[in-house]
Structure formats: C-alpha cells, structure tokens
C-alpha cells in the first residue's frame, strides 16, 4: 500500500512539473509575440515621425549604419 501511495505522489509531482513547464513555455512565447508587436509599433512610429523622404532608403541607411564594416550606402539607392 505504501508503494502505491509513493508512486501516486511521484506521478502527481511529475504531472505538476510538466504542467508548469508547458505553462512557462506558453508564457514565454506570448511575451515574445507581445515584444515583437511593440517593436513593429515603434518602427511604424519612427517611419511616421520621419518627414517625407524615401522610407525604404531611410531604413536601409539605418541598417547600414549599424553594421561595423559598412563603408558606403550605394546599395541603398537601388
């Protein structure tokens, strides 16, 4: 009888640990999706605040400036 109780307790502990692991993974993915949505919103605001100009070219220049070995912006004019 004692063995059965120990087995049942271990089974419940395993179920609890697995359930929490799945819940934590779902929470992390939900947080990641929310973070991505916020990043997209910031980019939209940045494009909106930036007056006139070519949006693609501005984004290209920003990306190029962040690269350490970018010497010129010729490819941005395409």
Swiss-Prot record:
Contains 2 disulfide bonds. GO terms for molecular function: toxin activity. Disulfide bonds: none annotated. Residues 25-28 form a propeptide. Keywords: Disulfide bond, Secreted, Signal, Toxin. Belongs to the scoloptoxin-04 family. This is U-scoloptoxin(04)-Er1e. The lineage of its organism: Eukaryota, Metazoa, Ecdysozoa, Arthropoda, Myriapoda.
């Amino acid at each position: 009888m004692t063995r059965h109780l120990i087995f049942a307790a271990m089974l419940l502990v395993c179920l609890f640990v697995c359930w929490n692991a799945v819940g934590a993974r779902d929470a992390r993915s939900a947080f990641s999706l929310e973070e991505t949505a916020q990043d997209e919103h910031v980019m939209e605001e940045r494009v909106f605040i930036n007056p006139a100009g070519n949006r693609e070219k501005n984004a290209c220049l920003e990306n190029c400036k962040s690269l350490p070995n970018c010497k010129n912006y010729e490819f941005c004019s395409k």
